[in-house]
Amino acid sequence: MKKIAIVILALLAIGTITQAQCRAFTKNRVLPNLLGYIQNENYNAALFMEGDESEVLMTFYGGKNYRLVVMGHPVLPDVEFEVLDTNDELLYSNKNAENKTVFDFRMANTQQLKVRVKVPDTGGTLVHQGCVTIVAGHKE
Amino acid sequence: MKTKILSVLMVVVILAGYMNLTSCSGCQKTKQDQPAMDNKKDSMDQARVEQLKKIFFNIPSPVEMASLIKKEGFSYDKKLLNKVESVDTYMGEAKQAVNLGIYGADLSYASIFDQKQECMKYFAAAKKLATAMSIDGGINDSIVAKLAEQQENRDSILKIVTSAYADLNGYLKENNRVEVSALVISGGWLEALYLSLTYAEKSNGSAIKTRVAEQKMVLENLLNYYSSFADRPVLNEMKSDLLAIQKVLNQVEITAQKTTVTKADDGVMVIGNGGKAEMKDDTMKALMDVVKQIRTKYIS
């Protein structure tokens, strides 16, 4: 019984460590890109596999400058991201900007925008899995 | 005894290897393993999509509301904030989480107005709550020490506060306490709304009133997020409170046209749809009444 408890505890600890790697990736690799901007307090990072796609609806205030950073772990192919309005009108795609991970923009008025993120499927023999993080920062 | 410990460790190592294959931050799996999983692929994909919905969520930070209050020329009012002395009276995870968010918004407000001593007090209260809730990430002694060192630099304090709360949010999400994270964010939003409403009432037709009206959109994001959690009792009370606020905010009229993308003189992309949020005075009064009532319930 004691042994089982030890195994379970050890596994829980390992699970936490592996999940925490996304937080470390975000802190060390992603957040330095927000230099000069005040970081948004929401945390958006998760493990993605090739072919995975996700979307987040965000509200941006009018008159402010924003920076959006979308980055994937280097083991993944270049992460694609798009910014769309609520009618699904495409406003920006990093595919048209040499797969840049940073997008700077200014809001003329307050508006909800969607950020769609995709890890392309390379079709290779190996299926890669890694952290993908979306962070936003603002400045006046 | 040694053999027993070794055999237990071996099991741990083997299972850890398996877990690393499924959940490391950057790793590979061979596609040879996939056919056996194909039958379950659709349901697994759906489960992953649902899981991602619970992680990927974003609303503006309370600091954005606080900075507008300062920009509009208003002064700091300590009396508006939740008392730090109340921290020991908050029992139960839901109430503690909401107040952790409320203290976070108060902290942002104090930071924007350069209230360094107040920041230290509010950070200490937030840390106390985080400790009571067994949250080790984000708010800890090292952050408190960092904050003490940065007493003279407002931007650094702001950076410490926002990154501490973002890290706390990340810690909760990574430790399967996503509901607690939702409550912390809701508490922060509620407090920022309360502070903005107080200033909006003092002013006449200011930008703050418009910003309050725009919370109709932010609340829609927040409630969408709540709908990704299937019947979690810990969220029920806050969800019904948010719905009560939404009932009033639904009276706000938002007009918008087609979104345009232009380039400013400095080369930055400008996005806009000419949207305008308008709120009548009686709606603002009704909003203040309901927000005050809900806030009082959580802070007392």
Name each region found by the language model.
Chain A
Residues 4-14:
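Sec-dependent N-terminal signal peptides
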Residues 21-23, 46-127, 138-140:
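Acidic, Ser/Thr/Pro-rich low-complexity intrinsically disordered segments
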